[in-house]
From Swiss-Prot:
Highest taxon of source: Eukaryota
Classification via Pfam families: Toxin_cobra-type (PF21947)
Function, as annotated: Binds to muscle nicotinic acetylcholine receptor (nAChR) and inhibit acetylcholine from binding to the receptor, thereby impairing neuromuscular transmission.
Matches recorded under SUPFAM superfamilies: Snake toxin-like (SSF57302)
Organism: Oxyuranus scutellatus scutellatus (Australian taipan)
Major localisation: secreted
PROSITE patterns membership: SNAKE_TOXIN
Paired cysteines (S-S): 24-45, 38-62, 64-75, 76-81
Name assigned to this protein: Short neurotoxin 1
Keywords: Acetylcholine receptor inhibiting toxin, Disulfide bond, Ion channel impairing toxin, Neurotoxin, Postsynaptic neurotoxin, Secreted, Signal, Toxin
GO cellular component: extracellular region
Coiled-coil stretches: none
Subcellular location: Secreted
InterPro entries listed in its UniProt record: Snake_3FTx, Snake_toxin-like_sf, Snake_toxin_con_site, Toxin_cobra-type
Length: 83
């Protein structure tokens, strides 16, 4: 019985990949590339793009936020996928 419980715990840890943290780009527009380590179990990165009087604005970060009409949003689920 103990062996079965230990096996289940090991399988759970392997399947859940406990301790994994997502890394996303977080630079804005044309700034130099920077990254951030996401917290709180966040498992996606985003890139939002929109235009205003100054030109095209790009925002990057962790998560997958909702956006207003006229803002293009791309969400992805691998490290540094939001370039």
């Amino acid at each position: 019985m103990k062996t079965l419980l230990l096996t289940l715990v090991v399988v759970t840890i392997v399947c859940l990949d406990l301790g994994y943290t997502m890394t996303c780009y977080n630079q804005q527009s044309s700034e130099a590339k920077t990254t951030t380590t996401c917290s709180g179990g966040v498992s996606s990165c985003y890139k939002k793009t929109w235009s205003d009087g100054r030109g095209t604005i790009i925002e990057r970060g962790c998560g997958c936020p909702s956006v207003k009409k006229g803002i293009e949003r791309i969400c992805c689920r691998t490290d540094k996928c939001n370039n």
